Amino acid sequence: MRDNIAKGITAGSNTQQTTYDPTRTEATLTTATTFALRRYDLAGRALYDLDFSKLNPQTPTRDQTGQITFNPFGGFGLSGAAPQQWNEVKDKVPVEVAQDPSNPYRFAVLLVPRSVVYYEQLQRGLALPNQGSSSGSGQQNTTIGAYGLKVKNAEADTAKSNEKLQGYESKSSNGSSSTSTTQRGGSSNENKVKALQVAVKKKSGSQGNSGDQGTEQVELESNDLANAPIKRGSNNNQQVQLKADDFGTAPSSSGSGTQDGTPTPWTPWLTTEQIHNDPAKFAASILILYDAPYARNRTAIDRVDHLDPKVMTANYPPSWRTPKWNHHGLWDWKARDVLLQTTGFFNPRRHPEWFDGGQTVADNEKTGFDVDNSENTKQGFQKEADSDKSAPIALPFEAYFANIGNLTWFEQALLVFGICLS
């Protein structure tokens, strides 16, 4: 039958689409204004689109003869929970698809909430689908090109020639703290940017063997950025931008008794607990579907699995343990050893907002390890109330969705980010 060879599937919409190679077992989907899966046959002919937002199992589509052309819950031995599962995933966006190598009609689709894609578009400077163009006056005019990309008009930066640093510094012999203000051009108060206030303490210098005065050592005592990570704000055009007052030094408006000037930790948009409590709404989902283009019930939903972030942190990678000092004098790196990483994706210095309030307490006075102790561990970022243990990482949706993917079929098992779902 013809449907034995019709096993190509792509994703795309309008003029943007990606053809799926039937010889491969997975393909990357593209996201645009409307999100749908596009079905192709081996000859490269587009057969139809599967737009989850427009499919309703309660009102199946019928042709002119009254025959049901789409019945997602008929045939293929589906479970009785399929209607409820469909309502949980119909408003989510497909971002990746993998074809079962043992069954040309069985596909696994990775779905994420639509708000996650919108947030990613905002981070990249892309406009939302319903966002109109915005324009200002004079040199501040902006244009919105394809896919809402905002591009500023090219203009010469005349302020670079007279750019200078102005500020106030106070120093003392036993310790010092400085607060500086950077101003471009030195004329307008609106261009002033508050610098981070960093308190340091100096150690007395030591003399070398030849009697020379030793170098003065300065070590970090506290850092406002570690205690109050950067917030993200949005203007009328929904552009994510950094504000000068977003370092958490402003008085707390929650009425919890926070003193003026005390840093208020940045709160993630969604915490691990929120995603865990409502995975149908906030979590990523895996949809297993059957699609036979020339069958009467061509598409059917097999099962739906929601990816719980707590399950991810409990099962993959192997451990959140802090790395140990090995016999080579190097730190053993594991995928989940994020508390000490300064270059990796899970990085408390690069993304301090991924750590809950109270976890971003840097221990800068202790080196944390001893070369003579092979079992020594470094605390790095730790909780104030439980300083003898390493702090677990919080996994809000930025880190959660950024590390989900790589759908791979292994015999009858489906692997997503190393987690076996079946």
Curated annotation (Swiss-Prot):
Residues 11-21, 205-216, 250-261 have a biased composition (Polar residues). Residues 170-199, 262-271 have a biased composition (Low complexity). Residues 1-21, 158-218, 246-271 are annotated as: Disordered. It comes from the Bacteria. InterPro entries: P1_N. Belongs to the adhesin P1 family. This is Uncharacterized protein MPN_502. It comes from Mycoplasma pneumoniae (strain ATCC 29342 / M129 / Subtype 1).
